[in-house]
């Protein structure tokens, strides 16, 4: 059976410290949490801790870049479409020019809103509702909610030039079982 995986490639990274590496891993975990949550937006969005969707994360650093692969604990097509919508949003925001005079969380949410998909699918509507919820939180002066932090994470990934890809990979336990055991 195949798992849904989100591959995030960051290029042109200078040597990064542990804190920056932890931030990148947190960003990728947020993308995974959004992908797991978008098919059921009536549920509570949980990014970390108890109640968060379990994931498996692999990190590879090569040359000037870092690649992270996060495998979701979901195999359904809805989660795959949600992950693709998030990847598309990050790519679109990266292409969206940043206004010189616009600063702050509201301006960031405006960038996300302009780049958000305008389709009629359930996932695209859920993305727009997520962004509208983040905007509502900001207007109510609640800037530390999960929605606002998740939206800012998507912007950070886009600003860092992250390439987000969604793919299917072989289930890790199944792959391990297929290999013969080797004595050590």
Task: Pin down the residues of each PLM region.
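Membrane-inserting effector segments that mediate pore formation, membrane fusion
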Residues: 48-114, 126-127
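Long, hydrophobic, amphipathic alpha-helical segments used as structural scaffolds
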Residues: 36-39, 90-97, 138, 142
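Proline-rich intrinsically disordered, low-complexity coils
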Residues: 39-41, 54, 97, 117, ...
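Intrinsic-disorder-associated interaction segments
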Residues: 14-24, 75-82, 95-98, 116, ...
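C-terminal assembly and membrane-engagement modules of membrane-active proteins
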Residues: 64, 68-71, 75-78, 82, ...
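Polyanion-binding surfaces on beta-sheet-dominated domains and ring/shell assemblies
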Residues: 104-141, 158
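Aromatic-enriched hydrophobic runs in primary sequence
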Residues: 9-12, 86, 142, 152
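Long, low-complexity
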Residues: 1-70
């Amino acid at each position: 059976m195949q798992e849904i995986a989100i591959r995030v490639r960051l290029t042109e990274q200078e040597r990064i410290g542990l804190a920056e590496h932890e931030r990148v891993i947190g960003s990728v975990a947020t993308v995974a949490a959004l992908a797991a949550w978008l098919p059921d937006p009536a549920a509570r969005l949980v990014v970390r801790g108890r109640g968060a969707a379990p994931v498996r994360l692999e990190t590879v650093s090569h040359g000037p870049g870092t690649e992270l692969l996060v495998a979701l604990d979901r195999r359904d097509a809805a989660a795959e479409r949600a992950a693709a919508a998030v990847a598309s949003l990050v790519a679109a925001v990266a292409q969206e020019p940043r206004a010189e005079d616009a600063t702050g969380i509201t301006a960031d949410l405006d960038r996300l809103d302009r780049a958000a998909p305008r389709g009629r699918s359930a996932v695209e509507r859920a993305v727009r509702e997520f962004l509208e919820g983040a905007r509502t939180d900001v207007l109510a002066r609640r800037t530390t909610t999960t929605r606002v932090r998740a939206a800012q994470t998507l912007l950070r990934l886009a600003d860092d030039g992250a390439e987000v890809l969604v793919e299917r990979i072989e289930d890790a336990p199944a792959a391990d079982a297929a290999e013969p055991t080797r004595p050590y």
